[in-house]
Amino acid sequence: MRFNQYSYINFPKENVLSELKKCGFDLQNTANHKDSLETFLRRFFFTYQDTNYPLSILAADKKTDLLTFFQSEDELTADIFYTVAFQLLGFSYLVDFEDSDVFRKETGFPIIYGDLIENLYQLLNTRTKKGNTLIDQLVSDGLIPEDNDYHYFNGKSLATFSNQDVIREVVYVESRVDTDQKGLSDLVKVSIIRPRFDGKIPAIMTASPYHQGTNDKASDKALYKMEGELEVKLPHKIELEKPQLNLVQPQGKAELIAEAEEKLTHINSSYTLNDYFLPRGFANLYVSGVGTKDSTGFMTNGDYQQIEAYKNVIDWLNGRCRAFTDHTRQRQVKADWSNGKVATTGLSYLGTMSNGLATTGVDGLEVIIAEAGISSWYNYYRENGLVTSPGGYPGEDFDSLAELTYSRNLLASDYIRGNEAHQADLEKVKAQLDRKTGDYNQFWHDRNYLLNAHKVKAEVVFTHGSQDWNVKPLHVYQMFHALPTHIHKHLFFHNGAHVYMNNWQSIDFRESINALLTKKLLGQETDFQLPTVIWQDNTAPQTWLSLDNFGGQENCETFSLGQEEQAIQNQYPDKDFERYGKTYQTFNTELYQGKANQITINLPVTKDLHLNGRAQLNLRIKSSTNKGLLSAQLLEFGQKKYLQPYPAILSARTIDNGRYHMLENLCELPFRPEAQRVVTKGYLNLQNRNDLLLVEDITADEWMDVQFELQPTIYKLKEGDTLRLVLYTTDFEITIRDNTDYHLTVDLAQSMLTLPC
C-alpha cells in the first residue's frame, strides 16, 4: 500500500484540540508526548472495558509490548510512534513491516513525527489498510453517538445519521418537456432516501436512465452488423443550426399535502459513493428520467429535453417545479427538507448527465462529480467522419441504446399502449443518426454539451481512465478545456478502463469528495481545495501526483517514422476476416504481435518523457482508391510491469460506508508483467482529413498530407523504453469492417509523430 492523501486539511492547533476533545480525545498541549499517546490510545480502544489488554497486544518495538513501554521510563521516539501508528492502521508488525522507518518511506506515509497532537489528529484522518480512515472506522464502531445530527472532523461530515431509520419515498416531478407530444408535461419518477433531521439537508443526485431497469433483449435485437463497405461520400461542407429546446408550462392545480404518499421499497442498485454520504447527512436521489419505467415520455437519449427533465428535479428541490404524489397529478409535495444544494454523481451515462446538467447553469447545482462522462455524443458513436462503436460493444449505436434505456416497455401496459409510438420515434432516430456516412449533423449537434460549457457555474470534479475506450479520454479532455476559466475544476486521471475508483486503496477519493461537499453543500468554511489534476503515475503501483493541467504543453518531442514507403493492405482472406469478426480480442492480440495487415514502427525513447495531451501524427499518405479508413495505436512495447485496466479485489467487504452499512470491496489496479500497454489510439476517415465539418474527395494514388490527433492522455516514458506505432485500416472492435481490396501507402520519410511533453 502507498498513501496518497489529498483530503487532509491543515487546521489551527486550537481547532485540532477542540475536534479531538469532541470525540473524547482529551489531550493537553502541555503534556509530554508519551503521556499524550497513552491518553489517546486508551480512548482509541473505547470498546474495551480493560484497555490494558489492547495495549498489551501491540508492540512498541521488537522486544517490548506497548503496555510495558508505557509502564517503563523509556521515552517515546519517532520509531515507536511510527510502529504504533502503522499497527493502528491495520498493518501487522513483523509481518507487513519490520522497520518502521523503511516502511514509512516505502508507503509514502504522510505524517512526519514532530508535534504529537497534530500527528495523532492527522493519523485519525489517514486511511487504514482496509480502506476507511481511522476516524471513520472508530465512528463506525460507536465512538460518538448516532444522533441524527451533523458532526465534523477535519472539515468532513461524519457518519452520525442512522442509515436504518431513514425516510424512503417516491415523488413524480413535473418536467418542462413533452417528449411524446401528448400535450402534457412528462413526469419523472424520483426515488428518495434521506436521513431524519429536523432541519434542511443537501442532496446527492444520480441521474441514471438504467436505474429502473434495462431492456437488454430489445437492445440486442437493435445491434448492427459491423461488416459493410466504407461509404464514399460526396464532398460538401456540413451546415448546422443552433440547437433549440421547446419547453412547456405547468398545467392545472394540485392540492399541496405535507408528505409523499408512495413509499420507496428496494431500488435496483445504489451507488456506493451515495451510500457513503447517506449516514453523513446527505439525501440520496435516484432519477431515471423521461422514457423510463414509472416515468412518462420518450427516451430522447442525451438531448437537452432529457437534461431538462433531470434539471427540473433540482428545480423542485429549490421550489421552482412541482412534484406530484402519483400519476394523477392531483396532489403535490414540496421538498421542504431540502436546503437547495445538490451534487450529482455516477459513471458513464450517469456522468454524462452530470456534464449535461452542469451546462444548463441551473441554480442549486453546486458540484458535479462526472465520472467517465460523455461531453459530445458524436464522439461516443462516431469519430472523425467514421461510424464507430464504443470499445467493447461492436455494433451498438444510438437506437440500440434507446431500446436499452426505454424501460417503459418493461411494464406490460405501457408496452401495449405505447410501443407503437416508441418504435415510430425510433425510426426517426435511425434516420437522423446517419450510419451511412458517419458525419456530424444536427442530430449530434443537439447532443453536444460543449456548446453550452460557458454556462457552467458548479464546481466540477471529473474522473476518467487512460484505458477507457468506451467513453474515450477525448470527452473529459474537451469538457475540461471548454469550462469557463473562473470555474474550479479537478480531474482524477487514473490508468484504469471504464471503472469507478471510489473504493481504491491508494487514494482518499471518497474523503476528498466529502471535504468538498461538506464545504460546498453544508457550508463549512474551510480552505479545502483539490489540485487541478490528480494523475495516477503509470510507472509504479499506487502512486498519484498533482499536475497543473491536462494538455496545454509548450514543448514537444518529435519522432521520425522512417525512410521508406510502406503499404497497408485493407483486405483480409475470408477466413481471417471471419475469425477477427467473431472475436475482436483475437484481432487486437495479433495486431499487437504484428500479425495483422499493418505498418509497425518501433521508436526508441532516448530520454525521459512525460506525455501530457494529444499525440499528433503528421502523415503523407495515399489510397489506391477513392476512400480510406486509417486506424492508429501507440503502444509502449516490451515485457515489463504495467498497471492493468481493471481493479482487482484486495479485501472483500472491508470498507464500511457508515456503521456496518453497505460494506464494499477494497480494490486496486494490479501492477503486473505484460508484453505491451496501449498509450493512445485514434481513427480517421480520410475524406474528413482536414475538418470534421468538411467532406473532401480522395483521388486514387494522390498523396495527401494529414494531421491526425490521437486520444489525449498523460503517460510517463523512461529512457530506454520503446514506443510502437501501429498503422492499419479496419479495427474489428471499433470501426466498420470493410473488406474491399484497396491499400493505403504511407511515405514514412515525410511523416512524423509529435508528443506534447
UniProtKB/Swiss-Prot annotation:
EC number from the UniProt entry: 3.4.14.11
Keywords linked to the UniProt accession: Aminopeptidase, Cytoplasm, Hydrolase, Protease, Serine protease
Transferase found in the keyword field: no
Molecular function as annotated in GO: aminopeptidase activity; dipeptidyl-peptidase activity; serine-type peptidase activity
Record InterPro entries: AB_hydrolase_fold (IPR029058), Galactose-bd-like_sf (IPR008979), Pept_S15_Xpro (IPR008252), PepX_N_dom (IPR015251), PepX_N_dom_sf (IPR036313), Xaa-Pro-like_dom (IPR000383), Xaa-Pro_dipept_C (IPR013736), Xaa-Pro_dipeptidyl-ppase/CocE (IPR050585)
SUPFAM superfamilies reported for this sequence: alpha/beta-Hydrolases, Galactose-binding domain-like, X-Prolyl dipeptidyl aminopeptidase PepX, N-terminal domain
Pfam families in UniProt: Peptidase_S15, PepX_C, PepX_N
The reaction(s) this protein catalyses: Hydrolyzes Xaa-Pro-|- bonds to release unblocked, N-terminal dipeptides from substrates including Ala-Pro-|-p-nitroanilide and (sequentially) Tyr-Pro-|-Phe-Pro-|-Gly-Pro-|-Ile
Active site: residue positions: S348, D468, H498
Compartments, as annotated in UniProt: Cytoplasm
Any one of the GO CC terms: cytoplasm
GO-annotated biological processes: proteolysis
Protein task: Removes N-terminal dipeptides sequentially from polypeptides having unsubstituted N-termini provided that the penultimate residue is proline.
Oligomer status and interactors: Homodimer.
Family note: Belongs to the peptidase S15 family.
PANTHER family with a match to the protein in the record: COCE_NOND FAMILY, PUTATIVE (AFU_ORTHOLOGUE AFUA_7G00600)-RELATED, PEPTIDASE S9 PROLYL OLIGOPEPTIDASE
HAMAP family in UniProt: Aminopeptidase_S15
UniProt-recorded name of the protein: Xaa-Pro dipeptidyl-peptidase
Species in which this protein is naturally found: Streptococcus pneumoniae (strain CGSP14)
Gene it is expressed from: pepX
